[in-house]
Design a protein with these regions (language model features):
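Positively charged, solvent-exposed patches that mediate nucleic-acid binding
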Residues: 1-152
Length: 152
């Protein structure tokens, strides 16, 4: 099946794939929330790397149909915002869904695009993000805490 022309792609290089990538983004603890979405951000390893996206849609949100609908809507919104250069480069983002209500129709798609763009701009513009980014790149950033040994 051929791709539609003019459609922005979503290659592997635009996705967070490994659990380590997700852990690094969550460990920095920089987030912004709006409506049903929470966006976590972390500077990428390379400042010239395009923005990458990871999705977290819990089974608490609904059944597989609802979760996959959210994922499709978020991936497409990210593709559109990224194609317009609406996201700051050199950052990794994780979107967490908090609500099961998926915005419907074309108006809903535009609403999700605006939310993603707004959240990304807000979290990157917050005071201390640049300092945390520099510390994280030097390895002095927040490290995941080791779990104490479990007692039996």
């Amino acid at each position: 099946m051929a791709r539609a022309t003019g459609r922005a792609g979503f290659p592997r290089t635009a996705r967070l794939l490994s659990p380590g990538d997700f852990a690094r983004v969550f460990a920095l603890r920089r987030s912004a929330a709006s409506g049903p979405l929470v966006l976590y951000a972390c500077p990428a390893v390379s400042a010239v790397q395009p923005a990458r996206l990871g999705l977290s849609v819990s089974s608490r949100i609904g059944n597989a149909v609802v979760r996959n609908r959210w994922k499709r809507r978020l991936r497409e919104a990210f593709r559109q915002v990224r194609a317009r250069a609406g996201l700051p480069q050199g950052n990794d983002f994780v979107l967490v869904v908090r609500s099961a209500a998926v915005p419907a129709g074309a108006a809903g798609a535009r609403q999700v695009e605006e939310m993603i763009c707004d959240l990304a701009t807000r979290v990157v513009a917050r005071p201390g993000y640049a300092a945390a980014a520099a510390a994280a790149k030097q390895g002095a950033g927040p490290q995941p805490t080791a779990q104490p040994p479990r007692r039996r």
